[in-house]
């Protein structure tokens, strides 16, 4: 339990930030999973559209500091590699 008003506020802020970070990470994972499932199913046109959305989600998470920029870049690279291999 926080002992001071500032500690109470810090606890509230930390909770809000944690929830926002969890939501954003969940969105990233969901968008990546969606693309992978579409690629595995063979629907490449839908997968390409979903990949654009996934890249945007990754960029936003990196911009907000939720993901490290290089982590986002690596995930985008692997996603596009999988998509391009399926297109061949």
Swiss-Prot record:
It comes from Dehalococcoides mccartyi (strain ATCC BAA-2266 / KCTC 15142 / 195). The keyword RNA-binding applies. Residues 71-81 have a biased composition (Basic residues). GO terms for biological process: translation. Gene3D superfamilies: Ribosomal protein S20. Residues 1-23 have a biased composition (Basic and acidic residues). Transmembrane segments: none annotated. Residues 1-28, 69-88 are annotated as: Disordered. Belongs to the bacterial ribosomal protein bS20 family. The keyword Nucleotide-binding does not apply. GO terms for cellular component: cytosol; small ribosomal subunit. GO terms for molecular function: small ribosomal subunit rRNA binding; structural constituent of ribosome. Binds directly to 16S ribosomal RNA. This is Small ribosomal subunit protein bS20.
